[in-house]
């Protein structure tokens, strides 16, 4: 089955007209398909049209899969924009993750910020730690009514010489500064408020996430 994209009747008619003259069953546009025309899927990343589901740990492996999905869908939607002279739908990124690697998270942050197609993020159930970095940079950010988010400090462990520990503290200070800067830019929180919140491991419900600017809208049930 072929899925088409359109944003208005004019574009829909144009797609259907081209399809009617197609003698080989070639579809006008298909977004990111796997073997046999099935949607591309992995354990942590599923793709269906302009919807990407990210359910898993923020790891280097999973970030690579997610970043590839974002780039592929973005590229295909930009092809659609040029071919049909119509604005494509946004990329809808659904997130359910307890977090993971801050470096992997920032890699996806940069991919989202460089997408030409708007990326809308949705919190499905929960997003914590590095996963909130990803959700926070969406062009529009949604959270479902019973979902929660958690932001907190970095965690790190190491062993070595005294100087190694000094270097590690400098590294951690640098990364924490990056995290605070992102939250400062993408929320309603002051630097002082961010510093205090990061000291705790406290979940925020949908209403609190909206209040502090982690999201833009609550998706209500029904």
Residue spans for each PLM region:
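Terminal-region recognition feature
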Residues: 1-222
């Amino acid at each position: 089955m072929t899925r088409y994209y359109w944003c208005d009747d004019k574009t829909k008619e144009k797609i259907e007209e081209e399809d009617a003259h197609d003698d080989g069953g070639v579809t006008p546009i298909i977004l990111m398909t796997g073997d046999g025309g099935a949607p591309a899927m992995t354990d942590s990343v599923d793709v269906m049209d302009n919807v990407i589901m990210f359910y898993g740990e923020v790891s280097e492996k999973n970030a690579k899969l997610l970043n590839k999905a974002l780039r592929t869908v973005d590229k295909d939607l930009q092809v659609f924009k040029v071919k049909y002279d119509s604005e494509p739908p946004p990329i809808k990124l659904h997130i359910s993750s307890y977090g993971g690697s801050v470096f992997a998270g920032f890699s996806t942050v940069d991919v989202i910020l460089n997408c030409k197609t708007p990326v809308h993020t949705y919190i499905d159930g929960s997003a914590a730690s590095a996963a909130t970095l990803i959700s926070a940079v969406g062009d529009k950010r949604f959270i479902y009514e019973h979902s929660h988010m958690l932001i907190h400090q970095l965690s790190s462990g190491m062993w070595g010489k005294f100087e190694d520990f000094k270097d590690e503290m400098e590294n951690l200070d640098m990364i924490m500064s990056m995290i605070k800067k992102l939250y400062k830019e993408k929320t309603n929180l002051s630097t002082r408020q961010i510093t205090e919140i990061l000291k705790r491991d406290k979940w925020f419900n949908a209403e609190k996430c909206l209040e502090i600017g982690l999201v833009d809208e609550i998706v209500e049930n029904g």
